UniProtKB/Swiss-Prot annotation:
Null mutant phenotype: Short root and increased root branching. Mutant plants have increased sensitivity to salt-induced osmotic stress and tunicamycin.
Expressed in which tissues: Expressed in the vasculature of roots, cotyledons and leaves.
Primary residence: Golgi
Listed cofactors: Zn(2+)
Homology family: Belongs to the peptidase M50A family.
Protein name: Membrane-bound transcription factor site-2 protease homolog
Residues in compartment: Lumenal: 82-107, 159-182, 459-485
Binding site for Zn(2+): 125, 129
Purpose: Metalloprotease that catalyzes the second step (site-2 cleavage) in the proteolytic activation of various factors, after site-1 cleavage. Part of a regulated intramembrane proteolysis (RIP) cascade. After ER stress, cleaves BZIP17 and BZIP28 proteins which function as stress sensors and transducers in ER stress signaling pathway. The N-terminal bZIP component is translocated to the nucleus, where it activates the expression and production of ER chaperones, as well as proteins involved in brassinosteroid (BR) signaling, which is required for stress acclimation and growth.
Active-site residues per Swiss-Prot or TrEMBL entry: 126
MF terms in GO: metal ion binding; metalloendopeptidase activity
The organism of origin for this protein: Arabidopsis thaliana (Mouse-ear cress)
A GO biological process held by the record: regulation of brassinosteroid mediated signaling pathway
Amino acid sequence: MEISGRRMRRFRMRFRRDHLTGGENIENEASCCYCDLKISNFNEPIFRLGRRFSGVLKVWFSIGLGFGVASLILVTVFLLLQFHSNPLFSNRLTSAVFGFSPSTRVSLSGIAYVLVSTVITVSVHELGHALAAASEGIQMEYIAVFIAAIFPGGLVAFDNDVLQSLPSFNALRIYCAGIWHNAVFCALCVFALFLLPVMLSPFYKHGESLTVVDVPSVSPLFGYLSPGDVIVSLDGIQVHKPSEWLELAAILDKENSKTSNGSLYLGGSRRFHHGKGYCVPISLIEEGYKGKMVENQFVCPGDLTAFRTMPCSNAAIREVSVCLDAKDIVKLQKCGDGWVTTSDTDNQSDCVCPQGDLCLQAMQSPGVLWTEITYKRTSSQDCSRLGLDFNTSNCLGTFVFVGDLIAMSHSVHLTAYQPRWLFNFFGKSFPNILERSLTCTFHVSLALVLLNSLPVYYLDGESILESSLQSFTWLSPRKKKKALQVCLVGGSLLSFLAFFRIFLLGLPLSRRW
């Protein structure tokens, strides 16, 4: 498409229109499918900045040129990998790049993070184009933000005649500048995430315990945990980071689904075994409700939980089935080999209880896991000052979760940052907001790199590919044009099929964002 006029660079689309005359005012456009806001206040400052540091910027954007061409090749390979025969592979690849799975449910707050991140990353992208053009002596005509149908975007407008007069190498520096700036911005986000614990260390502890940021009303933990609570352990295993929380939940769920009596190595000297029991006094058992057998299942009334004798080797088992209050039982001494141990002890001693007690375990159905969650209330100043000295604190609590552990672990929002007691009454969510903002900005910026590297029409990839083909001097103009058309048609078709597969057909659910 060759029309005299200026070229507009944008991360979504590119148009060329008639050249502006010197006294013509820039007017905003609005229609049923497109509207924009044009801004020309930054023309002179950006142009002066680009001309002042022209030499340095040309070196900087020459590096970006190499990155842009390499990105075009790598993104094409990524595009082809989307048609990998293994759906799980494609799903993980998409999640790694975009930060979410196609079937992921995005919350309202997540949408807000995406919108803010989009504004920031598009600004960085267009600033790259504007500075690169200024270093070549080309002043932009205006900056614009727009919405085309439902897709937001941004652009900078240049005089197309001046762009066409540039050597292909110089033009490539301008075309690759946007994705180069987005790539550098991704690196800055990663660096900021890495330094975040150090920067926030005067005000927040990091990696000691998990702090609850939010418990949605649909979460099974709603009513048990509150924002600001500190999760100490899951089934007796101390957790320090959200990733450890999810990993441990997956390990416990996997172990529960196994039918053998083997043990699972958790790292270090910790091992997980089968059979979680409690030493229950015989007097409490005799006072308990006996329950009823309904369709070969032991049923208890109300909120009572069914318990039975733990099967132990070399032990004189007294068969007992009784209904007890789980809130009272979890406070008792533990027995059985289903708890975390520091060594491989003799299984014969796992069921040993004090005289007058029996080792009982809760009856569980397949797919339902009995899990203890230990937490600390931090709503009072006294609890906050006690820190991790849980043994002397009456702020420590334990409750039992019975159900789908994987769904439960994803239903609550956690952070590894714990406010120091002076900041416990405000700013609890601040580290989480920073962390999510940086993470979301990283993924959006990376997505812009990939989108604008695609060999498709109306994106930066088209201009990069077109200028790159100009370097092949042995090809005639006709062959260059033909090669460009073949690459763009093929790239556009592959991109459409890939995104249709990713976002419309969907793939297996990965996680909640």
